[in-house]
Every structure is written in structure tokens, then in C-alpha cells.
């Protein structure tokens, strides 16, 4: 989603992209850990909960803790969804809801 990553670029950050797993389209947490090992200067994780289907949030939060990362979750595609009874958007240090035509929420 460009509306998830463009604000980072516009504010001088350099994103490091990782792939998703199939068929669930979740963030590939093995690739996240590999990227963190390859580049320890990475300071945060930002991703959107695709189709309201979150990755293993327990593992995400452990990665965040282990690497002292900032975690920003974009709930543009996950409004109303939960992980283990906890609403998406309540895990990260910051929660956003980006708007674009292909997301569940949009603006004119």
C-alpha cells in the first residue's frame, strides 16, 4: 500500500521491504528477522493488516521487543478485526488508518 509507506519516504526514512507468505498474504516474519540480522540499523516495523488477517502478533511483538523497534501498524484493511481477542491497531506504538481507493476505507 503506497499510503502506508509514502509518509515514511516523505519524512526521510528509507524503507526495507520484505515479502508476504502465501496464501494468507501476511508479513513474512522469517524475512523480517533475516532483514534485521542483515541490517541492524533498522529501527522499526510498519505494515498493514491485509484483509483484516493479522500475522502472528505474539511473534511480531517479540521481534519488536528483542530488537527494540518502533512498531507502527496500519489498520486501513483491518478495522474491526482482532488477534486473540485484542483489536488490531492496539498492538503498536502508533496506529494509523491510511486512506486509498483499494483499502477498506477511502476518501474522495
Regions found by a protein language model. Name each.
Residues 1-16, 20-29:
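Substrate-binding/gating loop at the entrance of the active-site cleft, primarily
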Residues 25-107:
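Active-site phosphate-binding strand-loop segment of PLP-dependent enzymes
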Amino acid at each position: 500500500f503506497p499510503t502506508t509507506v509514502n509518509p515514511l519516504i516523505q519524512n526521510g526514512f528509507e524503507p526495507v521491504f520484505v515479502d508476504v507468505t502465501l496464501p494468507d498474504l501476511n508479513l513474512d516474519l522469517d524475512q523480517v528477522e533475516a532483514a534485521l540480522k542483515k541490517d541492524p540499523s533498522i529501527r522499526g516495523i510498519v505494515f498493514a493488516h491485509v484483509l483484516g488477517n493479522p500475522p502472528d502478533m505474539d511473534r511480531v511483538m517479540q521481534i519488536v521487543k528483542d530488537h527494540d523497534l518502533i512498531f507502527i501498524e496500519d489498520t486501513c484493511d483491518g478495522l474491526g478485526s482482532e488477534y486473540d481477542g485484542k483489536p488490531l491497531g492496539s498492538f503498536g506504538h502508533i496506529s494509523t488508518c491510511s486512506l486509498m481507493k483499494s483499502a477498506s476505507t477511502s476518501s474522495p
